[in-house]
Swiss-Prot record:
The lineage of its organism: Bacteria, Bacillati, Actinomycetota, Actinomycetes, Micrococcales. This is Glutamate racemase. Pfam families: Asp_Glu_race. Its EC number is 5.1.1.3. NCBIfam families: glut_race (TIGR00067). Provides the (R)-glutamate required for cell wall biosynthesis. Belongs to the aspartate/glutamate racemases family. It catalyses: L-glutamate = D-glutamate. It comes from the Bacteria. One of its GO terms (biological process) is peptidoglycan biosynthetic process. The active site is at C73, C183. The keyword Isomerase applies. It comes from Leifsonia xyli subsp. xyli (strain CTCB07).
Length: 272
């Protein structure tokens, strides 16, 4: 069990931010990453579909023998976390609570913005997560085109800045001092988001805090990897275009992603 990989899943390349943070903090751990590019993006899809897609990918990871699951997707975290923790015998880590924890520590004024996909914002998952900090005022905002930009490799330029300004102006008007990047794709747009929000606004993402949660669970459970052999890091995608995923991975996290394998998930009937 200790030598088994950590399983990480996202709808596409956004979860690579989380995978990179886990590799930085736990360099001896093996990783198996799956991007569900067949169904990406998750954000605009009905929650029932997101739930089914997510469980199909998580089933695939468990079948491949992972020792811990990371749902590196805010939309999936909001849709399937409870199901996943009931369904699987391995620990399940999500990305919403880690971001909330960091935002609560970062804010000075108690005015916190959160941006995410339509699905994440509509789920009110962040409102629920921030409920334990009643002195904070939360300003949620859906930014649906941000995932589209990242998944097509566009992270800068006039159109990105124009769309970012349109999405973020209400948060500037609300005078937030902390902005939660409530989608793991959004750190790839951090330059544009930071430029639009201006100095004095702290941007909070879940990647580093999620990696801390993974570290804590592995150490406290006594199943961190001690093998002296180099760890393995594998990347899989459910879509038909592994080369596209590979190009984006090279651009965003570097040439260490040398291969992407295509995989197929099973089909789950959640009506049973």
């Amino acid at each position: 069990m200790t030598d088994a990989p950590i399983g990480i899943f996202d709808s596409g390349v956004g979860g690579l931010t989380v995978a990179r943070a886990i590799r930085d903090q736990l360099p001896n751990e093996s990783i198996l990453y799956v991007g569900d590019t067949t169904h990406s993006p998750y954000g605009p899809k009905p929650i029932a579909d997101v739930r089914r897609y997510s469980l199909e990918v998580l089933d695939l990871l468990v079948e491949q023998g992972v020792k811990l699951l990371v749902i590196a997707c805010n939309t999936a975290s909001s849709a399937v976390l409870r199901d996943a923790r009931e369904r699987y015998a391995v620990p399940v880590v999500e990305v919403i609570q880690p971001a909330v924890r960091r935002a609560v520590a970062a804010t000075r004024t108690g005015r916190v913005g959160v941006i995410g996909t339509v699905g994440t914002i509509a789920s009110r998952a962040y409102e629920d997560a921030f409920a334990a900090a009643p002195d904070l005022r939360l300003f949620p905002r859906a930014c649906p085109r941000f995932v589209e930009f990242v998944e097509t490799g566009v992270t800068s330029g006039d159109e990105v800045l124009r769309v970012a300004a349109e999405y973020l102006q209400p948060l500037r008007d609300a005078d937030v001092d902390t902005l939660v990047l409530g989608c793991t794709h959004y750190p790839f747009l951090e330059g544009a988001i930071s430029y639009v929000m201006g100095e004095g606004v702290s941007l909070v993402s879940s990647d580093i805090e999620t990696a801390k949660d993974v570290y804590r669970i592995l150490v406290s459970g006594g199943f961190e990897r001690h093998d002296s052999a180099p760890p393995t890091v594998r990347y899989e995608a459910t879509g038909l275009d592994a080369e596209h995923f590979l190009r984006l991975a090279h651009r965003f996290i570097g040439p260490e992603v040398s291969q992407v394998d295509l995989v197929q998930t099973g089909v789950i009937d959640l009506s049973l």
